[in-house]
Amino acid sequence: MKCLLIATGERVPTWVAQGFAEYHRRLSYWLPLELVEIEPSMRGKNHDPQRAIEDEGRRVMAALPKQPYAVTLDVKGKPLNSEQLAQRMEHWRGLGRNLVFLIGGPEGHSQEVLNISNERWSLGPLTLPHMLVRLIVVEQLYRAATILTNHPYHRGK
């Protein structure tokens, strides 16, 4: 199974890149994950945000592998606690398909991207910087892996 994290945005802050690299390294023993960065569209007072969303959506669609199982990070998605995410990870691994996590830009995902999503995952009702979301996602995937392998990292229930 190939696992991708397709994230809109480039040039993340150093501390985000360092945190992502650390959890990516830890996760790689259990679930090899490839980060694919999508160039964000121009934004500003003279740019149409809907057009930016559509442009980014086309770039995301072009980056998808064939027949992926797409999990879209979306505020309207299903919130999961760590144990529930671990259960979903076990399910996703058993599908035998390429697993793709999709992180949109500041305004979210295009309708085209939402339409191909097999699942929508919400990190909760908070508004988070989309650059920070990639770090949170990789840490949560690592946490899910430690739950499944009974590693002491997760100190939940």
Curated annotation (Swiss-Prot):
S-adenosyl-L-methionine binds at L73, G104, L123, G124, P125, L126, T127, L128. One of its GO terms (molecular function) is rRNA (pseudouridine-N3-)-methyltransferase activity. One of its GO terms (cellular component) is cytoplasm. It holds the Pfam family SPOUT_MTase. It catalyses: pseudouridine(1915) in 23S rRNA + S-adenosyl-L-methionine = N(3)-methylpseudouridine(1915) in 23S rRNA + S-adenosyl-L-homocysteine + H(+). It comes from the Bacteria. Its EC number is 2.1.1.177. The keyword Cell division does not apply. Its main location: cytoplasm. It is found in: Cytoplasm. PANTHER family: METHYLTRANSFERASE, RIBOSOMAL RNA LARGE SUBUNIT METHYLTRANSFERASE H. Belongs to the RNA methyltransferase RlmH family. Homodimer. NCBIfam families: PRK00103.1-4, tRNA_RlmH_YbeA. Specifically methylates the pseudouridine at position 1915 (m3Psi1915) in 23S rRNA. This is Ribosomal RNA large subunit methyltransferase H. The lineage of its organism: Bacteria, Pseudomonadati, Pseudomonadota, Gammaproteobacteria, Lysobacterales. The gene is rlmH.
